[in-house]
């Protein structure tokens, strides 16, 4: 609508007064951001934070239209989402623990046909998966689902694939977001040091230009709080 009206600004009102450096309900030292880029905002949304709808961010970037996230209940300035990237620093930390990793194990090697059959079955039952893959020994299929669907998925798979042993375990994504942060090795070193201090094992690390994503099986808000304090001043 903003683009169609050729408006200069778009204001989106909600029950929070802008975009924060982390979830203020979980991390009490979270800080409101004055400005953030569309690309960084997209990464925050993709990481699981429910701040702005993906489509809203995509349209803002496409039409080069600044978006202001503000509170319905106050006159505070809010957060400006724009094309411009101010600086290379950590802007946001997202903990997504609403996930479960599913393992489907078989005594014999899983054929390519079986691998695809399981995937099609999940699609047919409207189960959205991430990281769908086969283990190196080709005897386990593993993937990630939303925690809300864990009982449904367990029941469906056990009923359909009786020659597989189905198990689950906790799966947590910790995303550290900010343009160019992967060029600063000290950021990841600090995070790994804090995780090691609390004996939290890292399962995987994924990097792109704007995000460090660390896969864990657990992490408390207190630990995230310490990471936040270390990275965001």
Question: Where does each model-flagged region fall?
Answer:
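C-terminal catalytic "cap/lid" subdomain
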Residues: 1-233
């Amino acid at each position: 609508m903003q683009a169609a009206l050729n408006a200069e600004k778009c204001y989106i009102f909600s029950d929070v007064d802008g975009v924060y450096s982390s979830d203020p309900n979980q991390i009490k030292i979270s800080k409101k951001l004055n400005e953030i880029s569309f690309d960084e905002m997209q990464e925050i949304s993709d990481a699981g934070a429910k701040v702005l709808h993906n489509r809203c961010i995509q349209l803002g970037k496409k039409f080069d239209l600044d978006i202001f996230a503000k509170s319905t209940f106050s006159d505070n300035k809010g957060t400006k989402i724009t094309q411009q990237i101010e600086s290379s620093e950590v802007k946001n930390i997202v903990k997504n623990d609403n996930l479960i990793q599913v393992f489907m194990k078989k005594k014999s090697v899983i054929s390519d046909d079986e691998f695809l059959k399981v995937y099609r079955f999940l699609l047919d039952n409207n189960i959205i998966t991430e990281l769908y893959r086969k283990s190196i020994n080709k005897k386990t299929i593993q993937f990630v689902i939303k925690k809300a669907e864990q009982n449904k998925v367990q029941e469906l798979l056990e009923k359909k694939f009786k020659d597989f042993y189905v198990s689950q375990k906790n799966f947590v994504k910790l995303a550290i977001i900010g343009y160019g942060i992967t060029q600063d090795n000290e950021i990841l070193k600090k995070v790994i040091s804090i995780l090691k201090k609390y004996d939290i094992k890292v399962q995987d690390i994924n990097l792109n230009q704007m995000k460090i994503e660390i896969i864990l099986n657990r992490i408390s808000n207190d630990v995230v709080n310490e990471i936040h304090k270390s990275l965001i001043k």
